[in-house]
Amino acid sequence: MDLARQIAMELLDIQAVYLRPKQPFTWASGVKSPIYTDNRVTLSYPETRTLIENGFVKQIQEHFPNVDIIAGTATAGIPHGAIIADKMNLPFAYIRSKAKDHGVGNQIEGRVYSGQKMVIIEDLISTGGSVLEAVTAAQSQGIEVLGVVAIFTYQLAKAEQAFREANIPLVTLTDYNQLIKVAKVNGYITADQLVLLKKFKEDQMNWQS
């Protein structure tokens, strides 16, 4: 089994991902969704965590071999980023969603320098907005952001367009298409539910109709 399928299976097994097309979840945006993802759960499972961190290292070495600092997004990207930086013997920093309103007002915590080549770690890509704000924060300090690496993406068109417009490569360990295929093969969903899940990816507002 390749890495993308293996990680998709792990996410389903440990219930980091729930698929519920007939009883959709409500996202913070108000969107009714057949999927809910909480990749923080992966940190509680050592074997899953190791599989993910080794996957991150492999993808970074393959796609961004010139990296010289790892950053995590606050908060979900911090633990993964710190482990990866340790495995790769690289400096680590993390990026807040906004600058602190006290102290020295840092948005990036850790020692960073203009000219560094950074890879940013995220756990989940939905619209891509929050991690691309982290990219902008790093770039504003003269850092070259080589790309973003995440555990999982919903593969929404809005996110893919946002990364293209920002000219930032996105690499993920697994993705929505892979996950729903694995879910069907392993009996997590029925054929009818698979149809609904595919419709959601294409049209988040009208997939239930």
Swiss-Prot record:
One of its GO terms (molecular function) is orotate phosphoribosyltransferase activity. Keywords: Glycosyltransferase, Magnesium, Pyrimidine biosynthesis, Transferase. The keyword Glycosyltransferase applies. CDD domains: PRTases_typeI. InterPro entries: OPRT (IPR023031), Or_phspho_trans_dom (IPR004467), PRibTrfase_dom (IPR000836), PRTase-like (IPR029057). SUPFAM superfamilies: PRTase-like (SSF53271). 5-phospho-alpha-D-ribose 1-diphosphate binds at R96, K100, H102, E122, D123, L124, I125, S126, T127, G128, G129, S130. Its EC number is 2.4.2.10. Orotate binds at S126. GO terms for biological process: 'de novo' UMP biosynthetic process; pyrimidine nucleobase biosynthetic process. Pathway: Pyrimidine metabolism; UMP biosynthesis via de novo pathway; UMP from orotate: step 1/2. Its cofactor is Mg(2+). It catalyses: orotidine 5'-phosphate + diphosphate = orotate + 5-phospho-alpha-D-ribose 1-diphosphate. Gene3D superfamilies: 3.40.50.2020. Catalyzes the transfer of a ribosyl phosphate group from 5-phosphoribose 1-diphosphate to orotate, leading to the formation of orotidine monophosphate (OMP). Homodimer. This is Orotate phosphoribosyltransferase. It comes from Streptococcus agalactiae serotype Ia (strain ATCC 27591 / A909 / CDC SS700).
